[in-house]
Amino acid sequence: MNVTINGNELNVEVLGPEGAPVLIAHHGGGGIGSLGEPKATFGPLADELRVVVFDARGCGRSEGKPPFSHAQWAADVDGLREWLGAEQVMVAGGSYGGFIAMEYAIAYPDRVRAMILRDTSPDNSNLERAYENARNQDRIEINWDNFNRYWQGQIRDNEDLKARWQEIIPLYSHDYDPATALSQAAERADRGLYRYEAHNWCFQHNMPSFDLKPQLPGVRCPTLVTVGRTDWITPVSSAETIAALIPDARLVIFEKSGHSPQTEERDKFQAVMREFIHEVLGRTTA
């Protein structure tokens, strides 16, 4: 359904029973992400929760009125909360969506019941480590002009964004088979919805000053921090920093995953989430 939030139409799906605790999940990849990713990850929780997934402003099938800033995306999450009539919500996000989940918990502390983070970073230092990891890997030959344009927000159009994303997909998984990696990357890229304006905004305007470390000790909600052991772009060290800074956080490392433990170790990931949610709900209602 289309819902107007803060003057911008968002493509929204609501799963689960009315009256259940609400979880709002933000997708990753500003400009390359859409609601399909959090729907697959958090949708199974709709037997217990009211799960809300959506295409962020400027992403997927949503309208694209700028700015595509972290503050605006967090405000849109709160607009969804108001639209749902929920006093408090659980907020979740993976990768870039984790940035927005943390921004929301910082800006709207009284509205957050709990937070689930997956393979994300508290600041922009993960990009430096990603460059180092890219230089030291042997899966793909890096075209550094394309690589730099992607991570510096210099993408020309949606087709350029799709092509540049497809080139680096093989870096994201724990397991790698050179016989199938390129075809799998092409299939994954073909499933995407591309909005280069939002992508460029992320890396031209948002990331250069992104640093939540000073604010994270003030996050009061219980937080689950998850990460894949071989994540090249938001590595274990980033997750460890988040878990160390948020007072009521616990860290779970998935040993057989890269950037996507929610798919690479799906059963374990679902079990870890449910255990956390049951603890939160029990704590809240005790």
Language-model segment annotations:
Residues V219, V225-V227:
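Short beta-strand/loop motif that positions the catalytic acidic residue
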Residues E87-R129:
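Conserved hydrolase catalytic core segment
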Residues I5-G64:
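Conserved HGGG/HGGXW glycine-rich cap/lid loop of the alpha/beta-hydrolase fold
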Residues D248-A286:
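Catalytic active-site module of serine/aspartate enzymes centered on a nucleophile-bearing elbow/loop
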Residues M115-G153:
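Flexible "cap/lid" loop of the alpha/beta hydrolase fold
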